[in-house]
Every structure is written in structure tokens, then in C-alpha cells.
């Protein structure tokens, strides 16, 4: 069984799907915590993230 790699999104990119996205550190993929989760609508841009973090769908 193989683990599926989640797609990473960065601030300013267009969101492909309305969903809740969590922030993860770029260097080791550590989850920043639920207080930094953001709901982003399809077609909108991802909001600013923590320094050196990206978004992944939850």
C-alpha cells in the first residue's frame, strides 16, 4: 500500500477546490495546527500563510 502525496499550494495560487486547508512547514511538512486552517473557495487565491509554510487540503 502506498501513501498518497498531498498536493501543496502556496499563498497567491488559485484554489482548485472549495475545502479547508491546513498549513504545513515547507522543510519537514510539520502541521501548524488547527488555528491556522483556512477555508478557501474554488477560484479564490490562497491567503497569506505563516513564514515558510504551504497549504494542503485536510
Where would I find each of the regions flagged by the language model?
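A charge-rich, low-complexity, intrinsically flexible signal that marks solvent-exposed coils, linkers
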Residues: 1-58
